């Protein structure tokens, strides 16, 4: 069953997308100067084509002429070729009579012709500038009809945000054109999920039944059709309680290029990683719909609003954010603006290659408002762009998107592109992703996030950082912050050795310092320091923006003998203890059902009931809270007694799996979704060799279907054992039934007990059932080997072997931490292969049954 979005487009009146029709007010004429092969500017500063001008592609030329026509006050179109030529293209004024129904007297001859010369360059061979009709004045440009960015039936997208098919909006900082376009789209375009609305609700109900912390809400329109949807699972909601100070609404997937118009709410965790707070399917893009969405998000997050919010510049989103989050600092995603600039400024970048670099530096590397204003004016004047409409609209809205204007607010922006350029679903979702496939990839992305966060937690705890200074402050920070955040703090601290701080004012309690790099004393920063409160403020505002102290404040701390970080400069959200909840151990019971996921869900259900009872009165609340804290202390004692727990290996998550879009175990897939529209990647590292003998013929030993256990034998009883040298494997089918696929494992062990030492092979088979407990036990062993480095683990495999009298055989060997890590990666990959094959076989049999 193929799932798609249905668009019901009605007539759009004057705003209907078409190839013809322009606003025709006052006339505008000028002489054509063709003495510049790279393009010239006319008398009002608009870059125009000229004969001999070169482009790298046809699309690049079209983008240039589109922008030129818009700046001049007319719209253009691609003239279809009746002779089938692929080496010549003509872009003409929309008032041209060629191939149209216009009367000859109304025809306009303005055009540009490009020809393909060689294999790479398109060259302008003809340019007609004069029009036979009036052109739109500057204050009427926003009334020009939107242009199609498709050539005939060619539907290829050549640049993000450029193509504007019917029913789709693209980013524009021009409030007038944006508002007019959005109004028509919102009024006349209706998007629905169609027949999969029922499946979606059933999926949400199943998720909520399994996990009471799962939240979802649906907005209905006047026809009782699903209008917008929001959902968030318990892990996302818990993450918001710790890291919900800054939120980004990523709306790049709303456009019609994507089959699923979803928008994730994302944030940043204590490792600087992207995390998910919730997701929305946006079918109606009106003001009221976004108000509903933000209010629903706030309800799901227990009415805790964010400190800062990042969105696109959509008018409806701006209105909704102002109403629902009045206290939050709201900014526009600068990366959306920069992406749009690739289209709007294509003609300028072609004519002046250095322009793009200078503008980028102006936006991203200026540190004060005055510096930005000066740099912007310099760039605009240098390239004579004072009349460029789009750049002027950008400048008018500068306080909403240029980073320097909101450095006084917290955005958790520790790293340059963090929270802006990327997306939580990068690498998972593309333009062909359907709704059933989306939810499977959504779960895969969630599991990947969970695993990456745990890996970062373990790295922080188990691997001590290398200190670069004798500073007590560095040692303090190393024990407080996560590894990633400490790395940033350490970078700032080391830079203090290259900075000087000179006191320029002192009133007894507050001192003002001038801090500068000794190699660049002309660029200085002002730091004010209050001695009684031990608070410092720097003109760079790095701490206010990111929560990490800058090198300038740290330099002042050095000269004033502040040797450790004051408590108010240690943000809990950046520390290794940012998440207050105690993690549970991950030992797996023999039946395989008492996993961390089941225990977690059960505790969530009990905790919610407990919270509902405890919130009735203040007395009940105090008793409940006291018991929770007391219980937390007891759990901590138990956890310390049994040692660190192994990282959870959730269903569907593979250790070290590198491909994001491949789907792992079948239990990650909602059974209510059909699968015939999904392409699953097939690959096997062992496919290059000859086909191995069938497993049924090999009669290899099988891994016993029981979990592995730790052997606490005293170290002094240890004897020399074989060491693991290599692991190879292959895939075979035992039968045609689902799950009949097994992996044949070949371990090569080097036995030092023999003289001379020799290799020995151990071969056995694993199914997806027996592989899982083995993999989890190995992951636990790997953590135990994390320190000290000279420890080894002794592995004892018990195999079911029909060739022995007892029906069993044992093999014992030892592994180091690095060897076990390589073994883990191979086993995780094998698990993924077994899962993929199982899904394919199930799908194939289902198709046969349908036939």
Swiss-Prot record:
FAR1 domain mapped to chain residues: 63-137
InterPro entries reported for this sequence: FAR1_DNA_bnd_dom (IPR004330), FHY3/FAR1 (IPR031052), MULE_transposase_dom (IPR018289), Znf_PMZ (IPR006564), Znf_SWIM (IPR007527)
Domain MULE residues, every copy: 246-342
Domain of life: Eukaryota
Tissue specificity of this protein: Expressed in hypocotyls, rosette and cauline leaves, inflorescences stems, flowers and siliques.
Keyword line: Metal-binding, Nucleus, Zinc, Zinc-finger
Induction cue: Up-regulated in hypocotyls by far-red light treatment.
Cellular component GO terms, alphabetical: nucleus; plasmodesma
SWIM-type Zn finger ranges: 525-561
Subcellular locations according to the entry: Nucleus
Transcription keyword on record: no
Function of the molecule: Putative transcription activator involved in regulating light control of development.
Name of the protein: Protein FAR1-RELATED SEQUENCE 3
């Amino acid at each position: 069953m193929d799932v798609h979005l249905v668009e019901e487009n009605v007539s759009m009146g004057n705003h209907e997308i078409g190839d013809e029709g322009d606003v025709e007010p006052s006339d505008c004429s000028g002489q054509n100067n063709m003495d510049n092969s790279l393009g010239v500017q006319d008398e009002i500063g608009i870059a125009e084509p000229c004969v001999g001008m070169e482009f790298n592609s046809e699309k690049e030329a079209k983008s240039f002429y589109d922008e030129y026509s818009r700046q001049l006050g007319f719209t253009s179109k691609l003239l279809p070729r009746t002779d089938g030529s692929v080496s010549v293209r003509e872009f003409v004024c929309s008032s041209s009579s060629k191939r149209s129904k216009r009367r000859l007297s109304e025809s306009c001859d303005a055009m540009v012709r490009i020809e393909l010369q060689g294999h790479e360059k398109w060259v302008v061979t003809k340019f007609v500038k004069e029009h036979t009709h009036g052109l739109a004045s500057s204050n009427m440009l926003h009334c020009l009809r939107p242009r199609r960015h498709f050539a005939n039936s060619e539907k290829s997208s050549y640049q993000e945000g450029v193509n504007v098919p019917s029913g789709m909006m693209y980013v524009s900082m021009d409030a007038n054109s944006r508002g007019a376009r959005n109004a028509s789209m919102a009024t006349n375009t209706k998007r629905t999920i169609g027949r999969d609305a029922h499946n979606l609700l059933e999926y949400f109900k199943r998720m909520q039944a399994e996990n009471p912390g799962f939240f979802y809400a649906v907005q209905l329109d006047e026809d009782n059709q699903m209008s917008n949807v929001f959902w968030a699972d318990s892990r996302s909601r818990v993450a918001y309680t710790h890291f919900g100070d800054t939120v980004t609404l990523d709306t790049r997937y709303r456009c019609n290029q994507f089959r699923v118009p979803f928008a994730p709410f994302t944030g940043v965790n204590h490792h600087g990683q992207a995390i998910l707070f919730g997701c929305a399917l946006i079918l109606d893009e009106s003001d009221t719909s976004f108000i509903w969405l933000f209010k629903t998000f706030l309800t799901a997050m227990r009415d805790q609003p964010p400190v800062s919010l990042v969105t696109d510049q959509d008018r409806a989103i701006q209105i909704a954010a102002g109403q629902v989050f009045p206290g939050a600092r709201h900014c526009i995603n600068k990366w959306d603006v920069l992406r749009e600039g690739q289209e709007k400024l294509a003609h300028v970048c072609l004519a002046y290659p250095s322009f793009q670099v200078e503008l980028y530096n102006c936006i991203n590397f200026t540190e004060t408002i005055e510096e930005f204003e000066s740099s912007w004016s310099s760039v605009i004047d240098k390239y004579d762009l004072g009349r460029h409409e789009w750049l002027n609209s950008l400048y008018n809205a500068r306080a909403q998107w240029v980073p320097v204007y909101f450095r006084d607010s917290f955005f958790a922006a520790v790293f340059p592109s963090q929270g802006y350029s990327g997306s939580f679903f990068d690498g998972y979702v593309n333009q062909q992703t359907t709704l059933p496939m989306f939810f499977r990839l959504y779960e895969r992305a969630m599991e990947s996030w969970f695993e990456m966060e745990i890996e970062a937690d373990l790295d922080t705890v188990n691997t001590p950082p290398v200190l670069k200074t004798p500073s007590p402050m560095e040692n303090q920070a190393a024990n407080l912050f996560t590894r990633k955040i400490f790395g940033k703090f350490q970078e700032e601290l080391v830079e203090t050795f290259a900075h000087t701080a000179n006191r320029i004012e002192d009133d007894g309690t507050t001192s003002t310092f001038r801090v500068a790099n000794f190699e660049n004393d002309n660029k200085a920063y002002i730091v004010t320091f209050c001695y009684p409160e031990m608070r410092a403020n720097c003109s760079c505002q790095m701490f206010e923006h990111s929560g990490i102290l800058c090198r300038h404040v740290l330099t002042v701390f050095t000269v004033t003998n502040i040797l450790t970080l004051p408590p108010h400069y240690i943000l809990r959200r950046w520390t290794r203890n940012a998440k207050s909840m105690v993690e549970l151990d991950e030992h797996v019971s023999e039946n395989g059902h008492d996993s961390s996921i089941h225990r977690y869900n059960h505790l969530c259900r009990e905790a919610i009931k407990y919270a509902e009872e405890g919130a009735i009165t203040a007395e009940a609340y105090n008793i409940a809270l006291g018991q929770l804290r007391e219980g937390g202390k007891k759990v901590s004692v138990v956890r310390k007694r049994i040692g660190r727990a192994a990282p959870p290996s959730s269903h569907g998550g593979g250790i070290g799996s590198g491909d994001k879009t491949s789907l792992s175990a079948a239990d990650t897939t909602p059974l209510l979704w059909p699968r015939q529209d999904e392409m699953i990647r097939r690959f096997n590292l062992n496919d290059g060799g000859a086909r191995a003998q069938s497993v049924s013929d090999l009669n290899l030993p099988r891994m016993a279907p029981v979990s592995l256990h730790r052997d606490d034998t005293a170290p002094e009883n240890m004897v020399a054992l074989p060491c693991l040298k290599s692991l190879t494997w292959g895939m075979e089918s035992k039968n045609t039934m689902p799950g009949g696929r097994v992996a044949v494992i070949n371990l090569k062990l080097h036995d030092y007990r023999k003289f001379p030492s020799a290799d020995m092979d151990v071969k056995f088979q694993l199914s997806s059932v027996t592989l899982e407990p083995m993999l989890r036990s190995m992951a636990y062993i790997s953590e135990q080997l994390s320190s000290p480095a000279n420890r080894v683990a002794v592995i004892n495999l018990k195999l079911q072997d029909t060739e022995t009298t007892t029906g069993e055989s044992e093999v014992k060997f030892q592994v180091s931490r690095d060897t076990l890590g390589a073994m883990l990666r191979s086993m995780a990959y094998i698990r993924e292969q077994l899962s993929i094959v199982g899904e394919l076989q199930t799908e194939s049999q289902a198709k046969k049954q349908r036939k």
